[in-house]
Amino acid sequence: MSALALTRCGQRDRLGLKGPRAAEWLVARGIVLPTAPNSWTHSQESDGGGSILVARLGQVEFFLEEQADGTTLKAIAPSLNQRLQGVYPVLREDSGFHLSGEGTDAVLAQVCNVNFAALTLDSHPVIMTLMIGVAVLVVPQVGAARRGGAAGLGGAGEVEYRIWCDPTFGPYLGESLGAVVSECGGRYTGVSG
């Protein structure tokens, strides 16, 4: 197991959209979608580069985040400004965090009422909840299965958590969650790719 760590993730391209034709619009652009609400998948970029994390937030809303060096979201985002019928952009300027290492479940138990240790990770769950009073989106991933994340932050087979929140709450969430990580023997580091 690797050491407990919370890392604030660097800026990545993100895209949010919703509406009755949002899924159709994404599929037409080669994006692979999760079939079930509140689940995630990875979609390979069309140029064979990195991957895009695609989270389905309910039936008709999606959150996408690209690897640091990705180009797909930058290329397709401008077409959302064309007032498409049934496809509505959602501003995503989230602050992102990566929590990994031995003791993550103990940290999460102190800051959130969701029992993350009991989740079935094979279903690729997406959790929308409160963490230290802040609305967050959480994607648990198994280290060996991660693609498109910050490589090397967690060991193979370890459960790691991607966490996003409104950018105005990013500093507070980082400092507060970082303090709990430190109390549990881990470290909080600044920005990573």
Annotate each predicted stretch with a short phrase.
Residues M1-G193:
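Basic, glycine/lysine-rich polyanion-binding surfaces/domains
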